[in-house]
């Protein structure tokens, strides 16, 4: 009985904690400060600038082209000199872009995977064609590869002529286009995990198999992007090509940009606009095709 009384006294002496209804506290996520304004304003500003810089000039070309009668349009683009100019631009731009794809990828590989004296200098020199005026590049290349030039004089002794030939056009397009491939492939190679290559080597794969099965699928979309940019740039290139091609209709070294300029000089605006539209459509189809190939490659890699 005494024990029961002591127990009751302890219970009465113990303070009772009265818990009220639990409050549901919602933690609001702290908003990170935005460097740019909201989506609506940003999108509006971006579309406005894009319209002024890109869409409006392209729309102007389309508007002028639609005003040309179909018969006059076909007559402007069906001339032999125009066909030869398009054939020259397409073939030389494609060959130059293919060369840039191969050697640009090799150059990016060397700059990323190896450390050697002068690597930073070479990496900076790659962007020189972006900063150098194309006319200056064309004059320099024409002097260098002329019959009295440093390289041209040696090549002439071997029976090889560079200036005023399609080979000279390709060299000029390689010069202006190689930065596109290098700068497209270089970041992908830098982020590529080397453990996959080590795993392939441990499993007994040779270097060619490792490159074909592991490295190539990863860098292929970036390489195609650089190829497309170099190809599209080569189609409309003027300054670096005009001094080394010779612009001979007989030798078929006239490019599309030169023929367009000639038509503008002779006040043939319909002919120039028609050629500009065809060139614009070709460049768009090339870029669209490469983008679709990149998307397909990315989906294939994502489904592995």
Segments predicted by a language model, with ranges:
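C-terminal transmembrane helix and the adjacent membrane-cytosol boundary/short C-terminal tail
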Residues: 12-18, 41-45, 56, 60, ...
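Transmembrane-helix boundary motif in ABC transporter permease subunits
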Residues: 33-34, 95-126, 139, 143, ...
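Periplasmic/extracellular loop-to-transmembrane helix junction in inner-membrane transport proteins
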Residues: 30-40, 61-98, 113-114, 262-270
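Short hydrophobic faces within alpha-helices
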Residues: 86, 111, 128, 195-203, ...
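Membrane-interfacial helix termini and adjacent extracytoplasmic/periplasmic loops
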Residues: 29-34, 70-78, 83, 118-119, ...
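Transmembrane alpha-helices
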Residues: 44-49, 128, 175-193, 207-240, ...
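Hydrophobic alpha-helical transmembrane segments of multipass integral membrane proteins
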Residues: 52, 87, 91-103, 107, ...
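Interhelical loop and adjacent transmembrane-helix boundary motif
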Residues: 36, 73, 80, 238-289
